[in-house]
Amino acid sequence: MPNVESLNQHNKNYISDDAFEKEKRAHLEHNSDNFKFLYQEDIPHGDALDNHKLSYAVDIGSGTGWFANYLIEQRSYKKVYAIEPSSSAIEIAKKIYPDNKVKYINGFAEEEISKLKLSKPTFFSTMCCLAHLEDEDVLGILKTIDKIAPVDSVLACSEPWGDFYHRECWNIRPPEWWSDTLADWEFEFYNDYTLTDPPGRSKGFIAIKR
């Protein structure tokens, strides 16, 4: 069951009068900074993309489409699915990137991923969206990814990990919770970035389906 409070808070970012300009400006800043955003300590995506040359991707919680379009424009991906629950965010994405190279899907990942037909190794991405979902929903998403992902697919997550922690829309799970759920995947957990709230947790990991 989608977290309604989290969704409403998320959607507020995209319905304000200046939302389009804010998002467009943020995209330009990422681009002008030579895409260093993808190599921050808590974001494993840059490393994963450098080490695994794939051509297909599923961006979960794609927002206004910066990463999805980056994959096509900068990494020459052939097909990118961008799953986003906010229709307002998708509308902004289509205005920023009118070429329609990304396949946008308006809906919840736990419902939409199972509809995808993937035949080649795929790059799955999340950026701090699973942390806002309940364990049951995340389990559903992960098990569906496991079911449809071809061998050698990659899961790159800028998500917190560490001792269990649940507070309102902020959820953290330990490494074994992730690796037990995706038993056939090989995990690498990043510990360069340490959270301060709550303390003692880290953020970012990669998994490869074997």
Task: Cite the ranges covered by each PLM segment.
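Class I (Rossmann-like) S-adenosyl-L-methionine-dependent methyltransferase catalytic domain
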Residues: 1-54, 60-102, 106-116, 133-140, ...
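Conserved acidic residues
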Residues: 55, 122
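A conserved beta-strand element that flanks and buttresses the S-adenosyl-L-methionine
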Residues: 125
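Short catalytic micro-motifs in class I SAM-dependent methyltransferases
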Residues: 128-132
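Conserved helix-to-beta-strand junction in the class I
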Residues: 147-148
